[in-house]
């Protein structure tokens, strides 16, 4: 059996542009792509935290160190500059490999600069639920 697992994500990146006239894709700062192990033309999911939209596209390389996160083509209609997004990539792997798998998590600040690596917190760990 194979499972589809989160390979990596860039968490809470800020959209820097939306170019409707470009042919498609999402332009991502090359440093962020490297940190998240995303290569050019790799399929990625983009989840807009600001407005709830979700889409799939492919990544293309942006200028290293620029902080660029720009949705291109039709997807540009689903986001706006300053929206906060999560960019995720996935991988197929065996059940045995999935049990040991650790995704690469890249956390960024409001200018898309990398923050120190840390473990991801479950949502319930951040908010106390009252029954």
Curated annotation (Swiss-Prot):
User: Top enzyme class of this protein?
Assistant: lyase
**Annotated keywords:** Autocatalytic cleavage, Cytoplasm, Decarboxylase, Lyase, Pantothenate biosynthesis, Pyruvate, Schiff base, Zymogen
Catalyzed reactions per annotation = L-aspartate + H(+) = beta-alanine + CO2
NCBIfam families hit by this protein = panD
- Pyruvic acid (Ser): residues carrying this PTM: 25
Q: How is it modified after translation?
A: Is synthesized initially as an inactive proenzyme, which is activated by self-cleavage at a specific serine bond to produce a beta-subunit with a hydroxyl group at its C-terminus and an alpha-subunit with a pyruvoyl group at its N-terminus.
Pull one GO CC term from this UniProt entry: cytosol
Where in or outside the cell is it found?
Answer: Cytoplasm
What name goes with this protein?
A: Aspartate 1-decarboxylase
Q: How does it assemble?
A: Heterooctamer of four alpha and four beta subunits.
The prosthetic group or cofactor this protein requires is: pyruvate
Which Pfam families does the record cross-reference, listed alphabetically? Asp_decarbox
Q: Name one GO molecular function term.
A: aspartate 1-decarboxylase activity
* Free-text comment on the cofactor: Binds 1 pyruvoyl group covalently per subunit.
Active site per UniProt: 25, 58
Q: What is its EC number?
A: 4.1.1.11
Q: In which pathway does it act?
A: Cofactor biosynthesis; (R)-pantothenate biosynthesis; beta-alanine from L-aspartate: step 1/1
Name the family.
Answer: Belongs to the PanD family.
Q: Which cysteines are joined by disulfide bonds?
A: none
Provide the function of this protein: Catalyzes the pyruvoyl-dependent decarboxylation of aspartate to produce beta-alanine.
**Binding residues annotated for substrate, in chain numbering:** 57, 73-75
Tagged with keyword Cytoplasm: yes
What does the entry give for GO biological process? alanine biosynthetic process; pantothenate biosynthetic process
């Amino acid at each position: 059996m194979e499972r589809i697992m989160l390979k990596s994500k860039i968490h809470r990146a800020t959209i820097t542009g939306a170019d409707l006239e470009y042919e498609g894709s999402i332009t991502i700062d090359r440093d962020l792509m490297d940190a998240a192990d995303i290569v050019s033309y790799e399929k990625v999911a983009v989840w807009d935290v600001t407005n709830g939209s979700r889409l799939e596209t492919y990544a293309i390389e942006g200028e290293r160190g620029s902080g660029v996160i720009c949705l291109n083509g039709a997807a540009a209609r689903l986001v706006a500059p300053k929206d906060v997004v999560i960019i995720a990539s996935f991988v197929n792997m065996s059940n045995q490999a999935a049990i040991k798998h650790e995704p690469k998590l890249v956390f960024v600040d409001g200018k898309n600069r990398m923050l120190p690596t840390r473990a991801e917190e479950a949502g319930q760990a951040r908010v106390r639920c009252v029954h």
